């Protein structure tokens, strides 16, 4: 959707609020929200009018209330930088079965490492049986969870996440959860690059996933301070109160 649609909508409402993450089209709106970490207000200089309020960055990320509520408990847990639980979640239907590829990549980890794996799949996941087969061949305990309703709790209880560099990145940051991110769609690239540049996450190249993932995991075990640093930097990106911030801005229109 772009300006051509918004002009028509404006005839039937007082204010128009737009959520964008691409900055590649013009808008006719009173307020624009872009939650991307590396985005700047100037990216929209030629795309919105001068009177449009621009809310830019993950401090405005729209997270469910359980994430900011669980943030204090989660951050206290990060004082113990040992990896006991790895959380894997690609989101959506994972049509390309990246989850199975991640599990395959873990084969190159030191088999003597002591941790458990929790795999979260969406209700529309297409490759559950494949994931189960790969999971059963690993030397670690693997739990496969489908269509969960307690994602904040699962993140809080985990020590490292492996997942897509989409909107879930802000949930992980809110809880200070260190992450290895994968770019599964072009609009995730900016997020992944921003988090990696900040030191809040590591990006694993999807093309070399099976080759490189194990060495990354091994590195976290040999350098626990790296986890603490990543957690601290991730937690500084968003407090999870974006809903209130955005609501306040809308009420001021």
What role is predicted for each listed range?
Residues 28-97, 124, 128-129:
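A nucleotide-sugar donor-handling region in carbohydrate enzymes
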Residues 72-74, 80-158:
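Donor-nucleotide binding loops and adjacent catalytic segments primarily
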Residues 156-167:
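Acidic donor-binding loop of glycosyltransferase active sites
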Residues 161-163, 178-187:
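Short hydrophobic beta-strand element within catalytic cores of glycosyltransferases
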Residues 239-253:
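C-terminal alpha-helical cap of glycosyltransferases
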